[in-house]
Amino acid sequence: MHQDNSMRRAINQSRNGGSDSCDINNDREHDNINRNSYINNFHIENINSDKNEQSYIYCSDRAQVTDSILGNRKYTHEENINSTEMFSRTNYEYSNKNNVDIEMYNISNNNFYNGNNNGHSNDIIDYINNNNVNKDLSNTSNNADINTYIKKLTSNQSTAYCDGKGYNESANGSNFDINFRDVIKNNNNKNYKNNNHVPDDMLELGDRSFDSSFYIHNNVEEIDTERSNRLSFMSKLKMYFNYFGPGWIVAIAYLDPGNICGNLNVGLIRSDDFINVNSSVKDYTGYRLLWVLVYGHILGFIFHTLSMKLGHITGLDLAALCRKEFSSKFSYFLYICVQIAIWGAHLQAIIGVFVAINLILGIPVKIAILYTLIEAFAYSFLENKSLDLLEKVLSLLIGILVCCFMFNVFMTPINFQEVASSILYPRIPKGKLLDTMGLLGSVISAHIFYLHSNLTSKKKPVIYNDRMVKRYNKLGTIESGGSLLVSCITNCIIVLTFAEVNISGDDRKADYNLFNAYDVMKKYFGKTSMYIWSFGLLSSGNNASFMCEYASKSVFEGFLNKNVNPFFRVIFSRIILFIMLYAYVSYDKYTIDQLSNFINVVQILLLPLAIIPLYRFSIHKNVLGKFAIKGAFKYLVFVLVISIIVANFLLTLFDFLQYAPSNLYVIFIFISSIFYLLFIIYFFNMPITKTYYKDS
């Protein structure tokens, strides 16, 4: 019990040159005192259980610390969290510390921006080191608990935003500190404990315990700022692999079965001039649209850098920012629309999975669909187990997919001169305008930007300053560029594989799909190639399915600020998708193409719901501050946003009008188009009023 007085004296002497002071609580010597020390984010709390007395010490301001200890003044909660003078930037690891009830303390936005989230007062460290708190870690049963604490301290991810939502907000939208702690000792990182008696109605999604699976041990930050610019190549490589994850998961969206189906159809495009000529004449029309894939991935890279910066700087994902800025009704509307886009992509992913199962094992399609339910259990296990494990599994599946499709390209004689000509000299084959627009529209989907911002929000720098933010942005840019480069090459390989197929006019079908593409592979490349194609398709479907599940989780929590059991969420969505697919397959498995085309149209229409808020937040200084895009790049992105919206809108409009059964249908499409454009204009002009960025 004398340790509390020692600590107060240690901090007191740092202020008053060694002079002692009176105690806040005169009953400290009682054995029934319940002492809890919370050592994180410059915060200590001592609670007297008898008198229910609480004294808070916020070490972000040394004067406030001493005055609080002396009892000279009660500082308000708002004053404490808005204090700007830091105590220390040192990142201590509390190894060999036991008999201290260490609790993780989630702080508000404003307090977090004041400096190192893992900094601690030197006086506090001295107190722990000098008062027999140290124990041999090997002799304690709390080894795992303290290692978890160390893991969090050294994490490259923000303790203020556990799972992306470590904040809370009042009715007027302003941030406040919910005083929630995750008790490390004896809670196995799962149990909830509200030691501050915070009212239940103030506790929302952010009030969840720390999940160590979201954190990695090796820190991306280099604490020694004097040596930070002289990092070795291996250190930089290590930092990259520590960051590794978000970009590769997002790249899955560019390699889903829907994109694969579009790629093979583009590769099998043949000019009308070659339809009736001898099959020995080579037709390179299938090469002509490679430029769409290349430039589409470049567009995706630009928007992914914006979503990546949004997560790093604000610690919030795109969905959470929309919820905080817009009304609850509008947030619900956005959530429903984005969730529809996710379900559409998920349907295409499941189609690829059961088609691959049907090709590999010869199982009937209706039975192969059941595999998707097994896959749901696998995803639920991975999500509950560890996000890091999920990232590794997805990366493995991406590797399998890329290897399978690259193996096929070695079996085809690629004309690299035609490849270069297509990329450097963009042109559209005669009568293939809609195919071109459709391919461009399928490359970029709305939900991937929500997902990317969610993943990068977990990578927010623990040590928050301009240098660290720039480092994280650089790591994110490299990773996004590398993953999208691999995705672009893989998509081009699929196009080139089918572009090299010398199909005569008699063999050329109007449309190829995932069900009959294997006929082409088997006929022109052999049975082995067909199986390799099928395994690549299976990997693509599994990847995309897992990615859609996680995207669904992120938008649900971001827009609604609610949480639901992952098992029930996954099973519920899979049952709905299972019923829809089973109904389509029971009618005719080839009608899946019609469903896929309809999904592509929906994805195109919903894309503005992602790129508009992403652009708006990226240019606003209240959101990104000095990191907001400006100058020529700002106007370039604006032109790209408008061009994508207009191009996709015209594509959809022409597609609908092409099959208009009556004049009444045309009128309906025309009126709907007007409302759609008015909504886009309204969305573009919605104000952004709150501030999320604060100078470090």
Swiss-Prot record:
Swiss-Prot/TrEMBL keywords: Glycoprotein, Ion transport, Iron, Iron transport, Membrane, Transmembrane, Transmembrane helix, Transport, Vacuole
Cellular-component GO terms for this entry: plasma membrane; vacuolar membrane
Main location as per UniProt: membrane
Membrane topology term: Multi-pass membrane protein
Region spans: Disordered: 1-31
Extent of Polar residues compositional bias: 11-24
Domain of life where this protein originates: Eukaryota
Signal peptide bounds: none
Pfam families assigned: Nramp
Glycosylation (residues): 278, 502
Single GO term (MF): cadmium ion transmembrane transporter activity
Cited InterPro entries: NRAMP_fam
Vacuolar face residues: 256-288, 358-362, 417-435, 500-529, 586-596, 658-662
Sequence similarity: Belongs to the NRAMP (TC 2.A.55) family.
Record protein name field: Divalent metal transporter 1
Gene name per UniProt: FVRT1
